Amino acid sequence: MNFPRLLRHGGLLLWALAGAISVPAANPIGLLPANPRYFTFRGQPTVIVTSGEHYGAVVNRAFDYVRYLDTLAEDGLNGTRVFLAYREQPGAFNIAANSLAPKQERLVLPWARSAEPGYFDGGNRFDLTRWDEAYFGRLRDFVKQAGQRGIIVEANLFSCFYGDKSWETHPFHQRNNVNGVGQCAWDEALSLRDPKLVGFMDAYVRKVAAELRGFDNVTFEICNEPYIGGVDMKWHDHIADVLAAALRPGPGEAAANLSATHPTTHLISWNVANGTAVVTNPHPALAQFNFHYATPPDAVKQNRGLNRPIGDNETGFRGTNDAPYRMEAWDFLFAGGALFNHLDYSFVAGHERGNFAYPKDQPGGGSPKLRVQLGFLAGFLRTFDLGKTRPDTALLRGGVPAGVSAEALVEAGRRWAVYLRPASLSAQFSARWTGTLTPTESGEYTLHTVSNDGVRLWVDGRQLIDNWSDHAEQEDSATVRLVAGQPVPLRLEYFYGGGQGVTRLSWTRPDGTKEIVPASRLSRAGGQPGLRGEYFSGTQLQLGPRVLERVDATVNFPWGTDGFLGRQARNPATQLTVELPAGRYVAEWFDPVAPKSLGREEFSHPGGMRPVAVRQVGEETVLRLERQ
């Protein structure tokens, strides 16, 4: 028999389910009664933290979901999102090896094929009056396998359409079914205009609810991104009514939500917006509110009055590196979020262990390393009693170190935690270096910049390089005549939008020697060595706040994901001042990148402000305080 393995990350003990089969509880995942901003699952307060594939695990028969679910469980993650009746065409959104774009012969959907050819990319058209039992067998097994590993499945019933190409793949499109429905434009399909089409949608919703209501590890989302593509919110409310009726508790069944008028056995969520929006007058059956690309975590802060779980349910479009998404996760969950789901492009068919080497222009990231880091975050949150836990930055009244942003999470009277990261939100930043360049010999020089992302260079008041765009690492060059010993003004500007950052300034001298422009050739006002370096939050230089000014001897920065607070420039003696009640405490610092503990200390405190030395100001740092 396989028992759960106990893993240690520094001072944290984490459970990794190594194929262990959990016995389902009587009630499905629901709202935590003591604090309905979080979940309860199998008798335990729960936060959902995951890094999941691109939603095609069921509709793509080429995808080995057992291997995929094993990987999530081994990494300490407990959620996955799956689209039940939607596919994309290859190349959509520039996604390589998209698991949601299966080949036609590997596609399986809820409806059976008819005897008539004509589906848009081959195969027979669909008969919307008949179910494909092989599909529902695959769906049930997927949810069962997830449940055995303690993984919660979000079953997404519909998705908006993004244009003609996404609409023409769907069985509801008039050319893809034999039932005479779907004779409408892509931005009119998810509406109440065609009662016959709506009837097929209703039947599909009831069928899925009937198939999945026996599982305790399922939540339902009505529609992915209904704020795009003409989705009618009256239609959205109608589907909520149909689903709520199909999930109405029977004799002896408990309600997962807290609605007096629309009790349901399972939670139903609304995908509210990209970024943030203030939720007002939600449908009474909706008990969970999800956002996409929710950084900074304003969606949580603006909707605390809902007293319901808030999720950051899709990430991406911020480069392929781990750092932006790791910071997004810690920020969002420390702000009081209940769900974080990173869209992980390292999972594709044939690479269900999450080791696909996607191209640099993939619209997001994902990696084994990031999943371990997110598993560490999940384990960290499990050390808190979520029934008593709230975000509370009052802990930080004493201020935070310069150039640093912080979120704080507090278990009343018992535990306090602070997450510190560079103040440059989303890890995006811009920089300007100014000074003078003094050549060693007269002649024609070639100036070279290596950058990822944008770069601009002026020498002696003339712009030589202008590549102010989001691009992969590349070199740009320009020539200029310089006179030995004669200093000329130099200005170099750069922005980092995500991914693997790099900035280098080199030259090829008249004798053909190519090198980084040496520190001895660069100076500031008054002839002082080095360039003035100014660093700004965001990608637009002075439009974002300046968070750091320093002297840089040369411009030779393989930033990677470290950003301008690169580890070589961090100050280990920085102090954080926190406000605590009287008591005896154990303080422990963690590095969420390694991830590991950085050490512990004990102290007694009479109450009030208390300075605590930061063990490491790295890309991110976490402090946990426990009152004994």
Spans of features found by a protein language model:
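Catalytic-core region of carbohydrate-active enzymes that cleave or remodel glycosidic bonds
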Residues: 281-354
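Short strand-turn-strand beta-turns centered on an Asx-Gly dipeptide
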Residues: 42, 458-461, 590
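Bacterial N-terminal signal peptides
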Residues: 10-22
